[in-house]
Amino acid sequence: KEKIKQDKFLLDDGTFLPFLGGWFLYLGYELVMEIEKKIKIPESPYNLPTAILARVKTAVIHDKKEKNLYLISEDSKEEIEIIYKDFKKLANKKRTLKLLKNSIRIINKDSKTKHQKYVKKCIDYIFQGEIFQANLSRLWEFKVKKKISDELLYSRLRVTNPSPFSGIIKIGKSTIISSSPERLVSLKNRKIETRPIAGTRPRGSTGMLDVELCRELISSEKERAEHLMLVDLERNDLSRVCEFGSVKVDEMMVIESYSHVHHIVSNVSGKIKKHVKPGQIISAVFPGGTITGCPKIRCIEILGELEKVGRGPYTGSLGYINNYGDLDINILIRTMIREGENLSLRAGGGIVADSIPEKETQETEAKANGMLKALKEIYFQ
């Protein structure tokens, strides 16, 4: 059946558009228990399926650089007319920020003491020789009044924490609101890429301080060692689905700056083996090593033990697979999950042998800052 479906679509070499119809993909973090059957971790606390694959026959693509909007349909011009009419309605819709005071309040946050206690436990596991690095996360929970729309939360997050792999998805009564900076994996014309992020510093209050923080980050032996470890993990993951000898690091340890943090980023690529299907690619790389640790399976088990609550969408993925098998999938970090009046978010960081617990807690706050600022701008007391 899969082969018949794939044969219906021909690759259009003339198009520059990444998507001309295909499938939308959502993967919850707990999908790892289906990929690695021996892993047992806490179940997701959210009313969401573990994974979704939804057929998408119509799409809107916004080329921000060229300032062009493309309306796409596999079926008919009538579908495009419907999309166009929807856009006209949106253009006439008025937005308001009135009556939002006292609309958001924090109800729970993993305390600094609690987080630092678990950082120390990760370090203990490292010295016991069980792991080399683990990406421990910290939880914030809020009550948000219903008059605050999901779209408003997302629009504010796009302002306070603009990122290249952002998205909003409504699934039943749940909404995932993400401003992720990280790609898990992409595939185009048999070239597969992953772009690991590991190593963080907060943005400086002045230009000079920003430059100094970037210099300190890229020269940090701790951060470089952690990053190299995770690049090797990603190379190993890609090697499972790539032609022998084709995997390479084509961009090594560059600084990328976002609204609230600086990151060290690399790019790992390879040539995919013939007849490898999207499911095999996902099984090879999911969940990403940068948000679990090394070795991946043991880290996932330890993180489940320490965090105690399932992650759900956090550090899962969303993205697309197009009709001829190419794909682009993110890692759901800098992400909020909303269900009714309940809203939660997580932020984490990599723990290594010489980690300082207080600094690791500060890093989670720097990473959460864009999301917290979005809530505060609406009204956060």
State the predicted function of each range:
Residues 1-381:
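Extended alpha-helical targeting/anchoring segments
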